Swiss-Prot record:
One of its GO terms (biological process) is queuosine biosynthetic process. One of its GO terms (cellular component) is cytoplasm. Keywords: Cytoplasm, Queuosine biosynthesis, S-adenosyl-L-methionine, Transferase. This is S-adenosylmethionine:tRNA ribosyltransferase-isomerase. It comes from Streptococcus pyogenes serotype M3 (strain ATCC BAA-595 / MGAS315). Belongs to the QueA family. One of its GO terms (molecular function) is S-adenosylmethionine:tRNA ribosyltransferase-isomerase activity. Pfam families: Queuosine_synth. It catalyses: 7-aminomethyl-7-carbaguanosine(34) in tRNA + S-adenosyl-L-methionine = epoxyqueuosine(34) in tRNA + adenine + L-methionine + 2 H(+).
Length: 342
């Protein structure tokens, strides 16, 4: 298949720049790929799509304030680092600007020198491996000095950084939010649980590769980014019990899908506790092993995320749903509206 097979027209004014005042007041497009139906609804009605005995699976990763502004002590030149992933100890893979000035051995100071970074390796596309030195606890230092790394298509300043976190965000480590979860409120989750739906949490730390456009024409040549995931034994057991009792595994967002399908592929359809790195690329032709339904936001044209949704619901039907969403002025991307895919 070709990357252009997943293109669609998207007016720029439909790219949501700010979150709605109420998380669950966003619109929800409910699609059923077998019946080929589409229903316009609102997100707080997602509870009607869930049955007692189902499992709702959410990614509890927390976005780090991963954008750091500092300067080189020798030249006082300004430097921006974007933390991508913790490789080991105090070493991180980062995206550096301007990268050409940062050679191995270069140092960058942040916040009057409370945090220092030393370049220890050079990667392609402006990537660097840095080692941080600091006093105290790294995450606390980062909270005091770092900024929330909003996606490149959001140009408005975010008034409240917590609006780029889910209400259940817990495990620090992401460079971007698992945005399908931004619609849930604590109250809505309580109502869903009271209906008899099992709330299950996993972790996948979202990397910036999620925004990286597919740069090849042939999908088979695309090099998928790697992200760290983890599913506990308790969560795995709940999901096995749900499946055995005839309930559905309903994933919240593409990150939850990628975690569950990584594990399903690794264990021949069985759901086992597991952790590691995944670069799974789900595209049309993929056979789903764990996920029965899911919610997700509206994604970028030609992105791997549109391809994932198409793998589940069929490319033609998904693009038809996207055209409907454009016609009905749904809001797109991270702060936008959602779809529920049966």
């Amino acid at each position: 298949m070709n990357t252009n097979d997943f293109d669609f027209e998207l007016p720029e004014e439909l790219i949501a720049q700010t979150p709605l005042e109420k998380r669950d007041s966003s619109k929800l497009l409910i699609i059923d790929h077998r019946q080929k139906t589409m229903v316009d609804s609102h997100f707080d009605h997602i509870i009607d799509q869930l049955n007692p005995g189902d499992a709702l699976v959410m990614n509890n990763t927390r976005v780090l304030p991963a954008r750091l502004y500092g300067e080189k002590p020798d030249t006082h030149g300004h430097v921006e680092l974007l933390l991508l992933k913790n490789t080991q100890g105090d070493q991180w893979e980062v995206l550096a600007k301007p990268a050409k000035r940062l050679k191995v051995g270069s140092q960058v100071n942040f916040g009057d020198g409370h945090l220092k970074a030393t370049i220890i390796d050079e990667l392609e596309h402006g990537g660097r491996i840095v080692e941080f030195s600091y006093d105290g606890i790294f995450l606390e230092v980062l909270e005091s000095l770092g900024e929330m790394p909003l996606p490149p298509y959001i140009h408005e300043k975010l008034e409240d950084a917590e609006r780029y976190q889910t209400v259940y965000a817990k495990e620090n480590g992401s460079a971007a939010a698992p945005t399908a979860g931004l619609h849930f409120t604590t109250d809505l989750l309580k109502k869903i649980e009271a209906k008899g739906v099992h709330l299950v949490y996993l972790t996948l730390h979202v990397g910036l590769g999620t925004f990286r456009p597919v740069s090849v024409d042939n999908l088979d040549e695309h090099d998928m980014h790697s992200e760290f995931y983890s599913l506990s034994e308790e969560a795995a057991q709940t999901l096995r019990d749900v499946k055995q009792a005839g309930g559905r595994v309903v994933a919240v967002g593409t990150t939850s899908i990628r975690t569950l399908e990584t594990i399903g592929s690794k264990f021949q359809g069985d759901i086992q506790a597991d952790s590691g790195w995944t670069n799974i690329f789900i595209k049309p032709g993929y056979q789903f092993k764990v996920v029965d339904a899911f919610s997700t936001n509206f994604h970028l044209p030609k992105s791997t995320l549109v391809m994932l949704v198409s793998a589940f619901a069929g490319r033609d039907f998904v693009l038809e749903a996207y055209r409907h969403a454009v016609d009905e002025k749904y809001r797109f991307f991270s702060f936008g509206d959602a779809m529920f895919v049966n």
